[in-house]
Amino acid sequence: YRKDRKTGVEGLTLAGLLMFGTGQAIRERFDNVFMDYRNESQVTADIRWNDRITYDGTWENNLFNFFTKVTPKLTEDLKKPFKLEGGVQRIDDTPIHKAVREGFVNMIIHADYLMDAGVLKVIKRSDSFEFTNPGILKLPLEDIYRGGNSKSRNPHMQTMLRLVGFGDNAGSGFPTILDVWKSEGWIKPELIEDTNLDQVTLVMKMEKESAEKSAESAEKSAEKSAESADSKIMERMDLSERYQQILAIMEAGI
């Protein structure tokens, strides 16, 4: 909800409608947007999914309801080590729970809701999570993996979710996911951009990284560090040479 200070006009924003509006009002304005959750853990040839949440008339189809209905289903099978806060209250939340929620939040805030067609799709498998949203990446993959920069397509949605306790600060969400997965020794989460379908999928596999891949990753990291160090040395050498040239010109009285 917002008021234009110049015109005095006030009303519900599109972000507010998508987040908290009624399903009917949302479909009247965004008849191209769909939400779909499927649990595909231990499926067989005859069973395509074990659980599903989509438009079925039993719930108000806005983004916040979708998020709050699906999130517990995503995390219910994750391990919860016994830990007490202040020696009294049990803590059921873990970094893995937080990373999964962050993947969900990223899908919502980076989706393009103005496309002709698009599905916010969440798939849970026994060893992975997949979050797919319509729209292409707004930053190069390298910048996203590095973190620190943020170009949320829907900053107002991001603010709404953060105010109710979901989502990290701008630019830190995806690195949080990477750090948690790395600490578990799992395969690095992968962002897949499909420019033909105009969609992005985040794949978070709970699968141990092989020793070979781990060594390769460490080698690449070392190479990048070495390249960065070499670059800095070259910059200093270049500055030193220019400084010597300037001194020579000054001494010559030019």
Question: Model regions: which residues?
Answer:
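C-terminal regulatory or interaction extensions
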Residues: Y1-I254
